[in-house]
Amino acid sequence: MKSAEIREAFLRFFEEKGHTRVASSSLIPANDPTLLFTNAGMNQFKDCFLGLEKRAYTRATTSQKCVRAGGKHNDLENVGYTARHHTFFEMLGNFSFGDYFKRDAIHYAWEFLTSDKWLKLPKEKLWVTVYATDDEAYDIWTKEVGVPAERMVRIGDNKGAPYASDNFWAMGDTGPCGPCTEIFFDHGEHIWGGPPGSPEEDGDRYIEIWNNVFMQFNRTADGVLHPLPAPSVDTGMGLERISAVLQHVNSNYEIDLFQSLLNAAADAIGCANEGQASLKVVADHIRSCGFLIADGVTPSNEGRGYVLRRIIRRACRHGNKLGAKGSFFHRIVAALVAEMGDAFPELKQQQAHIERVLKNEEEQFAKTLEQGLKILEQDLAGLAGSVIPGEVVFKLYDTYGFPVDLTGDIARERNLTLDEEGFEREMQAQRERARSASAFGMDYNSLVKVEGETRFIGYQGTSGSGKVLALFKQGMLVDSLSAGEEGVVVLDQTPFYAESGGQIGDCGYLEAQGLRFDVRDTSKAGGAFLHHGIVDSGTLTTGAQVEATVDASVRQATALNHSATHLLHAALREILGEHVSQKGSLVDSQRLRFDFSHFEAIKPEQLRALEDRVNAEIRRNSAVEIEETDIDTAKAKGAMALFGEKYGDTVRVLTMGGGFSVELCGGTHVNRTGDIGLFKITSEGGVAAGVRRIEAVTGAPALAYLNDAEEQLKQAASLVKGSRENLLDKLGGLLERNRQLEKELEQLKAKAASAAGNDLAASAVEVNGIRVLAARQDGLDGKALLALVDQLKNKLGSAVILLGGVQDDKVVLVAGVTQDLTSRLKAGDLMRQAAAAVGGKGGGRPDMAQGGGTDAAKLDEALALALPFAQQAL
């Protein structure tokens, strides 16, 4: 059976047993911030097992995509060198949420594996393990299924603590847990290894193919196990492993799925498929990279993006080992889509995007590799000993995006090691700097703890009455606030919108007889709305009835910008591709800011197309439709939800442009798209790797922006004595004249340097037949000094040269050594000494080096170092 047939057979089998087929969840866990990537089938059902979520079904079956690379579960360094380690794998699973338990789970597993209708595995080839004290499971296997006792193994606490066992599973130190039973396949005595529980169990003869976890206890902090009222089942069978068994091979890389990827990788690289470890690395990594990018991860220098970058660069490195010329990795995506696109449609939908991201990262890595190697070479040139300092490793990582494992590979090739402790110290220092930079003061609002909820009545209008439920001053609950005092007011109901979803909180005022409280901002604490402000007059007390009035002009201006972000989001997905997803936003009364996933800068013509598309929807003046429904119905209608956002049972769906934009949103919006008036992008740029930002204005601020631009054009035209119509021609003429003058200046500098070179050559000192020259040349930049050193090398023959000068209050230094002397002394060594003398740094090649510093008063001392440097070396 092919891998795709096995996957479908598994899902169909459990559908026939009353299970609901559930699609694989994203590789980015939606409900577990502690998890880097989805790494097991049960991840998406965690809240079901904890009793926090109820679904419409109590039986489920999935083929879950999983990644293990980075974090606690990290197989990266083993991939390619063993038969069964992967960064990406599929986990087939069946789950029971308080429905069936051990008996049915065991019988289902045995039936699927051994019956003639399904996989037809020889029963005598299967071994089973159970937890040592799980007599119930043991009896089901032996007395009902009929597994002989000699192929049953009880596994005790083999990890040094109670319930610490290969056959006892726990979600954590406390919480749901229980025994598990595992099924092993015996590949035969021609392969080394012993049965589970034996000293030789790590061999490849007996391979675990299916694990059934029985969650039947809740472990409390004292270590006591208490029976769960509704026990559950969580099972997992690796598709790659069961495919290897059914296809009669002993390595996952020999199954049909991997063979097609290995062949595609060999074609892309230009090598033969001969089972090389590096080729296996590439074939494995295209799966994890393709699926991670399809799920919205982009290469970066932190978090999930950094893990993705490491995997891509590891694949590129291994491709280069096999002789790849130029970028190749992105060319394997088509084979991945052909192999797995039917089961996972997101691969087909995102194929072009995946290829672009990979190609872009490959090209960027080639530049990084070249630049990083130059820096590393400079540091290694002056290395004393065989350990690369931690600060060097950190500089390569932090400044140049050089993965630490890549630096380690280069070090190993040169019989060097890394100062890993030093690197960790640098990393820790960076974390401390980041923490101290963000800890700038006490946020008293974070201390506010409120019981009860505020009902929001602001969709219907901008005013309403409310009762004061609580008052806070500097985070402390108080009974009253007097004139001049700042505080927080909580009402039972309010028209004030609380900051959420990127939209700022409303401002306005609360009034009662003899009282006015100016509301400067509104936020949320749980279900309560916090009105932040100051008492302008009178005294505000708990229980008081107040009239709440929102600043309607600010609310309306904010609504224009919020509605425009929805139109912009839809336009981005239409013009740039469906890989675009919102990463953050800020909406206030003056502007909008929208962060989104995209791997490259937006071209000017694309920005114009975005503006045109949004303004076209504004001119259509279509009604903004608002509907409240349940989350599943909303998603079925195509409504976009923000990743990681928690939604209640009822959600608010906003539709604009007759379906052009459909999003879940609780913010305030315009009634018709025409109310926005005008949309104008003011800036676009990158804020992080794979994340771009657009800032824009709407309505009156957009018109003011265009008027300002018009006025600046008029002023620019006036400066060049032209008009708006001929401004570009005038500027072009000025730039061309400037280029001519710069060229003439360079020619004059070259003549002056040549003349100076003749004079300088005569002042060189001879040391053991070698000419040594150190001279001060103020006013020349680094480029001019380099040219002068080259000229002096030709004039002097065998020579050591150090030139320096002061330009713009900074010291510029250039050192040169003729090629015949570089085996005895190096320009980089001389430069490091000279630059240090003027309070700076420098380095370079053995024959030419540059540097500089800030202490101009020490320049002559620095130049004086050239002669003793040469004397000592010669």
Curated annotation (Swiss-Prot):
Family: Belongs to the class-II aminoacyl-tRNA synthetase family.
Official protein name in the record: Alanine--tRNA ligase
Protein biosynthesis in keyword set: yes
Record function comment: Catalyzes the attachment of alanine to tRNA(Ala) in a two-step reaction: alanine is first activated by ATP to form Ala-AMP and then transferred to the acceptor end of tRNA(Ala). Also edits incorrectly charged Ser-tRNA(Ala) and Gly-tRNA(Ala) via its editing domain.
UniProt GO cellular component terms: cytosol
Pfam families assigned to the protein according to its UniProt record, in alphabetical order: DHHA1 (PF02272), tRNA-synt_2c (PF01411), tRNA_SAD (PF07973)
Annotated Zn(2+) binding sites: 562, 566, 665, 669
Reaction(s) catalysed (UniProt annotation): tRNA(Ala) + L-alanine + ATP = L-alanyl-tRNA(Ala) + AMP + diphosphate
UniProt keyword list: Aminoacyl-tRNA synthetase, ATP-binding, Cytoplasm, Ligase, Metal-binding, Nucleotide-binding, Protein biosynthesis, RNA-binding, tRNA-binding, Zinc
Record-linked PANTHER family: ALANINE--TRNA LIGASE, CYTOPLASMIC, ALANYL-TRNA SYNTHETASE
Name of the coding gene: alaS
Annotated S-S bridges: none
Keyword field contains Membrane: no
Domain notes from UniProt: Consists of three domains; the N-terminal catalytic domain, the editing domain and the C-terminal C-Ala domain. The editing domain removes incorrectly charged amino acids, while the C-Ala domain, along with tRNA(Ala), serves as a bridge to cooperatively bring together the editing and aminoacylation centers thus stimulating deacylation of misacylated tRNAs.
Needed co-factor(s): Zn(2+)
E.C. no: 6.1.1.7
Species this protein is from: Stutzerimonas stutzeri (strain A1501) (Pseudomonas stutzeri)
GO molecular function, one term: aminoacyl-tRNA deacylase activity
Primary enzyme class: ligase
PROSITE patterns according to UniProt: AA_TRNA_LIGASE_II_ALA
Co-factor remark: Binds 1 zinc ion per subunit.
Localization annotation: Cytoplasm
Database matches in NCBIfam families: alaS
GO BP of this protein: alanyl-tRNA aminoacylation; negative regulation of DNA-templated transcription
